[in-house]
C-alpha cells in the first residue's frame, strides 16, 4: 500500500496521479481507514482472525476486469469511480492485480490516492467519500468482506448524503463538524 495526495491533473484515471506529497498510515488512521499487510502465502488464518475481530460474517470474490465483469465492465468502472459513500464499511483484501482507492480527506476535501496490490487489506469506513479505479493493468481480484449479507450500495455525493446519519457519524468520529 502506498498513499499520497492525488494531483488533480486531468487525464487517464488509471495513471498514478502522484502529486509527490506522501500520506502516512497515521494520517489514514485519523480518517478511520484501517490497513493490514497479510502476505498471500497462508493468508486465510490471518484474514479469518481480522474478520472475526471485526464481526465480518460473509465474504465473496470480485474480479474487476473485462473477463470478470463481461458486458457490465465499462458501466461498473464508471460507477466505481463516481464519488460516493456507503452506509457500511468497504473491506477489500487484494489477492491479484492492483488498483487505486481515492478517499476524501476531511475537512480539506483533498483526494488521497491509496494504491493497493496483492496482500493489502484495506477497510474504508462507512460515511467517507471515496471512489475506486483500476490501474493500467486493468485487473484486480479481491475478497470482499461483509458484516451482514453481501451488498454494495453506493450513495453518490449530494446534498442528501451530507445529512446522511452515517456521514454525520463518520465526521463526528474523526472530529470534524461535531
From Swiss-Prot:
Source organism superkingdom: Eukaryota
Compartments, record wording: Cytoplasm; Nucleus
Annotated cofactor note: Binds either 1 Fe or Ni cation per monomer. Iron-binding promotes an acireductone dioxygenase reaction producing 2-keto-4-methylthiobutyrate, while nickel-binding promotes an acireductone dioxygenase reaction producing 3-(methylsulfanyl)propanoate.
Reaction catalysed by this enzyme: 1,2-dihydroxy-5-(methylsulfanyl)pent-1-en-3-one + O2 = 4-methylsulfanyl-2-oxobutanoate + formate + 2 H(+); 1,2-dihydroxy-5-(methylsulfanyl)pent-1-en-3-one + O2 = 3-(methylsulfanyl)propanoate + CO + formate + 2 H(+)
Pfam families: ARD
Name of encoding gene: ADI1-1
Cofactor(s), by name: Fe(2+); Ni(2+)
Xref: InterPro entries: ARD, ARD_euk, RmlC-like_jellyroll, RmlC_Cupin_sf
Any Gene Ontology biological process: L-methionine salvage from methylthioadenosine
EC number: 1.13.11.54, 1.13.11.53
Stated family: Belongs to the acireductone dioxygenase (ARD) family.
Protein's job: Catalyzes 2 different reactions between oxygen and the acireductone 1,2-dihydroxy-3-keto-5-methylthiopentene (DHK-MTPene) depending upon the metal bound in the active site. Fe-containing acireductone dioxygenase (Fe-ARD) produces formate and 2-keto-4-methylthiobutyrate (KMTB), the alpha-ketoacid precursor of methionine in the methionine recycle pathway. Ni-containing acireductone dioxygenase (Ni-ARD) produces methylthiopropionate, carbon monoxide and formate, and does not lie on the methionine recycle pathway.
MF (Gene Ontology): acireductone dioxygenase (Ni2+-requiring) activity; acireductone dioxygenase [iron(II)-requiring] activity; iron ion binding; nickel cation binding
Taxonomic lineage from the root: Eukaryota, Fungi, Dikarya, Basidiomycota, Agaricomycotina
Keywords: Amino-acid biosynthesis, Cytoplasm, Dioxygenase, Iron, Metal-binding, Methionine biosynthesis, Nickel, Nucleus, Oxidoreductase
Gene source species: Coprinopsis cinerea (strain Okayama-7 / 130 / ATCC MYA-4618 / FGSC 9003) (Inky cap fungus)
Official protein name in the record: Acireductone dioxygenase 1
GO cellular component, as recorded: cytoplasm; nucleus
Binding sites annotated in the UniProt record for Ni(2+): 84, 86, 90, 130
Pathway: Amino-acid biosynthesis; L-methionine biosynthesis via salvage pathway; L-methionine from S-methyl-5-thio-alpha-D-ribose 1-phosphate: step 5/6
Residues bound to Fe(2+): 84, 86, 90, 130
Amino acid at each position: 500500500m502506498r498513499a499520497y495526495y492525488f494531483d488533480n491533473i486531468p487525464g487517464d484515471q488509471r495513471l498514478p496521479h502522484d502529486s509527490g506529497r506522501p500520506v502516512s498510515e497515521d494520517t489514514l488512521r485519523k480518517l478511520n481507514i484501517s490497513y493490514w499487510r497479510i502476505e498471500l502465502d497462508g493468508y486465510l488464518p490471518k484474514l479469518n482472525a481480522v474478520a472475526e475481530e471485526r464481526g465480518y460474517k460473509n465474504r465473496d470474490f470480485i474480479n474487476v476486469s473485462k473477463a470478470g465483469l463481461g458486458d457490465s465492465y465499462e458501466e461498473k468502472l464508471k460507477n466505481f469511480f463516481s464519488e460516493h459513500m456507503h452506509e457500511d464499511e468497504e473491506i477489500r483484501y487484494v489477492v491479484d492485480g492492483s488498483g487505486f482507492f481515492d478517499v476524501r480527506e476531511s475537512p480539506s476535501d483533498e483526494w488521497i490516492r491509496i494504491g493497493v496490490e496483492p496482500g493489502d487489506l484495506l477497510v474504508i469506513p462507512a460515511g467517507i467519500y471515496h471512489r475506486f479505479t483500476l490501474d493500467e493493468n486493468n485487473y484486480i481480484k479481491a475478497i470482499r468482506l461483509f458484516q451482514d449479507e453481501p451488498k454494495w450500495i453506493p450513495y453518490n455525493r449530494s446534498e442528501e448524503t451530507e445529512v446522511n446519519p452515517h456521514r454525520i457519524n463518520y465526521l463526528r468520529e474523526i472530529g470534524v463538524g461535531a
